[in-house]
């Protein structure tokens, strides 16, 4: 239950050179996958073998998103990350999956967690970019100009502008107003991955789910989905329901260190 403003404080207390992973950097990672694997469905079964032409096939598997038993994630560890720290270190900076087995656990007389085998994944060294827990992205805010309009997307990768203001950010487009599976991204001239049109399924078009809310408050973006989200999760799973600095037990952030080129 940490708000984004407190996330900023905590990460600076840990290391002043660190920051929350921002939308623009996350977007670049997503496009790296989309181009390398030539699909938008990162939950396709993992296949380590290349095609005869030397291309990747499949995706990164289900990740941790099959921990879908009702209330199991909460009972297991109160919505904290499931993968032990360093569990995927042997994959290095490559892409791959590794089984993680959770045994049957009797919580009390009224609740038992059923045994399940999950497949946490890495993409080019980044662990569990989807599933596990919702990622709160820095440098992006959504807000309607009035009650009858859709959310305008305000974004920046300038870390001096990482705050809750919209006046110091670029307008990148308009977010879809409906909930559902994503058909079309905003794209624009900076390859935005915010949903523009809904109307797909979990196995067609962008394959990931979009949740939004109809009010005029400033919204933050939670992405990737959580461990209980099943097919709704994925790189482009976008949730813009929450007001800026809302707290959630099943959301967190990725940290990064920015290096200036020499």
Kindly give the residue locations of the regions a language model identified.
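Short aromatic-cysteine micro-motif
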Residues: 1-129
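Extended alpha-helical regions
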Residues: 103-114, 144, 156-158, 164
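Extracytoplasmic/secreted cell-surface and envelope-processing proteins
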Residues: 29, 145-146
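Disulfide-stabilized, aromatic/cysteine-rich ligand-recognition loop
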Residues: 2-5, 9, 17, 21, ...
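Generic structural signal for well-ordered beta-strand positions
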Residues: 134-135
């Amino acid at each position: 239950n940490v708000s984004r403003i407190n996330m900023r404080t905590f990460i600076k207390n840990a290391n002043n050179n660190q920051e929350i992973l921002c939308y623009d950097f996350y977007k670049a990672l997503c496009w790296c996958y989309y181009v390398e694997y030539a699909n938008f469905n990162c939950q396709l079964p993992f296949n380590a073998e290349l095609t005869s032409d030397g291309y990747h096939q499949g995706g990164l598997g289900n990740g941790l998103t099959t921990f879908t038993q009702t209330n199991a994630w909460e009972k297991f560890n109160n919505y904290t990350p499931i993968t032990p720290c360093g569990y995927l270190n042997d994959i290095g900076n490559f892409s791959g999956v590794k089984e993680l087995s959770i045994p049957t656990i009797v919580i009390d007389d009224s609740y038992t967690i059923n045994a399940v085998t999950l497949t946490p994944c890495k993409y080019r060294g980044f662990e569990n970019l989807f599933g596990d827990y919702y990622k709160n992205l820095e440098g992006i805010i959504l807000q309607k100009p009035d009650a009858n309009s859709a959310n305008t997307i305000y974004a920046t990768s300038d870390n001096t502008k990482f705050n809750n203001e919209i006046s110091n950010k670029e307008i990148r487009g308009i977010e879809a107003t409906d909930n559902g599976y994503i058909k079309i991204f905003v794209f624009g001239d900076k390859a935005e991955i915010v949903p523009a049109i809904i109307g797909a399924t979990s196995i067609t078009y962008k394959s990931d789910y979009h949740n939004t809310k109809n009010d005029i408050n400033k919204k933050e973006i939670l992405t990737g989905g959580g461990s209980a989200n099943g097919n709704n999760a994925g790189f482009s799973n976008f949730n813009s329901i929450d007001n800026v600095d809302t707290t959630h037990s099943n959301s967190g952030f990725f940290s990064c260190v920015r290096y200036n080129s020499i």
